A protein has these predicted regions:
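Preference for protein termini
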Residues: 1-279
Length: 280
């Protein structure tokens, strides 16, 4: 196998994730590269083929019915490694950012102090077709949280600092694919997970389940929850199916639901069951 240092070919204007300025492998990459070095000849190629077969069998694809020229979703055998201390800083910053966005939503759908004080231009909100005036709470009990999901696009600049490219708050996709990719990688390259302290993702699923349950009305001990999908023609239908299984909730379409007296019910063979919260 050729020198792993030869894998790095970043231009001078870009940050080299693998190699330092002194041409040495960064410490947090040494574990995974050591595992790859230890594989027998052709081992990595065989692992990649195995992973791709698993993804095909599980149906982990992105439907490209509207764009036949779009590239397919492919498996990258080399995971992106982030040092623990660096991830801790990223995590803290993203939590703070998500909390800020949630408080902004709570204000816009509540007292609207940001508009009254001129910190946010009123026309920016009222002229936006996505602003749901009927959901504004002027009296009564407001939701404990408005932003249930949050994703972000990050980029690292040449100086090594991370910057936010875009915030995604309207049903961001990708979590299901990340979970499936981790599962397949763990089965295809188990040596890495035995020798490297990898942070597991199960807690993410558990917390997501708990956050959905928290959206149910007060006093509901065992809320009925579901994942709502547009159907099998959706570009991310695999993710909807996968998340429903991981969250242990039913996958439903619009035709499975009915509304009576402003309450959503899930239609079943025998009766209709009140739906307390859902992921869409």
């Amino acid at each position: 196998m050729e020198s792993l240092r030869g894998l790095s070919s970043s231009p001078a204007s870009a940050y080299d994730e693998l190699v330092t300025g002194q041409k040495s492998i960064r410490y947090h990459w040494q574990g995974i590269l050591s595992v790859i070095r230890s594989l027998p000849g052709g081992g990595l190629r065989e692992r990649v083929q195995s992973a791709r077969r698993q993804l095909e069998e599980s149906g982990a694809t992105v439907n490209m019915l509207d764009d036949r020229g779009a590239p397919g979703w492919t498996f990258d055998p080399l995971p992106f490694v982030i040092a623990p201390d660096e991830w801790s800083a990223i995590e803290s910053g993203l939590i703070q950012r998500a909390q800020l966005l949630d408080r902004i939503l709570a204000d816009l759908y509540g007292p609207q102090a940001l508009l009254k004080e001129g910190l946010v231009p009123p026309m920016l909100v009222h002229a936006n077709r996505h602003f749901l005036r009927a959901c504004r709470v002027t009296d009564g009990v407001a939701p404990s949280r408005y932003l249930d999901q949050y994703a972000v696009d990050l980029v690292r600049l040449a100086d090594g600092r991370w910057h936010v490219l875009a915030d995604h708050t309207e049903v961001p996709s990708g979590a299901g694919y990340a979970l499936e990719m981790r599962r397949v990688l763990a089965r295809s390259l188990p040596e890495a997970f035995r020798s490297i302290p990898v942070r597991h993702l199960r807690s993410f699923v558990d917390r997501w389940h708990d956050s959905l349950a928290a959206l149910a009305p007060a006093g509901v001990a065992n809320p009925n929850m579901a994942v709502l999908t547009p159907g099998s023609l959706s570009a991310t239908y695999f993710e909807h199916v996968y998340l429903a299984k991981q969250l242990a909730v039913p996958l439903v379409e619009a035709g499975d639901l009915t509304v009576r007296h402003n309450i959503v019910f899930l239609k079943t063979d025998r009766k209709s069951t009140r739906l307390n919260s859902s992921h869409t």
